[in-house]
């Protein structure tokens, strides 16, 4: 998940979305030999949320993370009917930049500002964790991006982390009765879009999901 911002500075040119987001997760070798950057994260997440029946119209969302993945998510949420986003990040400066991709009236907060984080959680319908925190966790020391007492049963909780599939955040949310969505679907949907960029053909999503699930289980 890291290095997408750095990659945006290394390619020869980028798609309009990748330029705006300053995030590249896909590099295409063009016919002239140039390295062309693309961002498929946001579209991949939207397709995954749709497959889980998550509706974004008129929704309020808390996004934890303001890196390349977080910015892509925020931009996609805005394009798909979300009306308010709170961006929570360790660096308030990064959160303030990322909130520029959100609908008007959205706000940026520091993850260390617990009262603001609690208020944002109370106001939102959907919580999306968009950092690498928890990636590769063993379970011996659960890594949580926020205090779990903030979660309510009505929340939909999405974790972009896909290894492990059932992160500490998702386990805690499941115990609260929340609808949970792990990171595998987004990984697969955005990877399918990458394959389409590279080969011109969109692969079978279900076959990819099955193979990825087996590999990560």
What are the residue ranges of the model-derived segments?
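Glycine-rich adenosine-cofactor-binding loop
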Residues: 39, 54, 58-78
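Glycine-rich helix-loop-beta junction characteristic of Rossmann-like nucleotide cofactor-binding loops
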Residues: 51-55, 149-151
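Rossmann-like adenosine-cofactor binding region
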Residues: 104-180
């Amino acid at each position: 998940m890291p290095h997408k911002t750095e990659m945006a500075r290394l390619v020869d040119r980028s798609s309009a979305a990748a330029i705006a987001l300053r995030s590249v997760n896909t590099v295409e070798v063009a016919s002239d030999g140039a390295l062309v950057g693309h961002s498929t994260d946001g579209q991949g997440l939207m397709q995954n949320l749709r497959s889980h029946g998550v509706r974004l119209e008129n929704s309020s969302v808390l996004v934890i993370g303001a890196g390349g993945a977080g910015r892509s998510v925020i931009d996609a949420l805005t394009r798909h009917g979300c009306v308010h986003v709170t961006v929570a990040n360790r660096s308030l400066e990064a959160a303030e930049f990322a909130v520029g991709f959100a609908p008007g009236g959205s706000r940026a907060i520091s993850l260390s500002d617990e009262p603001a984080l609690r208020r944002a959680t109370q106001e939102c319908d959907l919580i999306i964790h968009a950092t690498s925190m928890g990636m590769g966790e063993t379970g011996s020391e659960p890594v949580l991006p926020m205090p779990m007492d903030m979660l309510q049963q009505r929340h939909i909780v999405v974790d972009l982390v896909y290894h492990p599939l059932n992160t500490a955040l998702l386990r805690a949310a499941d115990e609260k009765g929340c609808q949970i969505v792990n990171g595998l679907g987004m990984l697969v949907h955005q990877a399918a879009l990458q394959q389409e960029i590279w080969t011109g053909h969109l692969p079978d999503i279900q076959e990819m999901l099955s193979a990825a699930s087996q590999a990560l289980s």
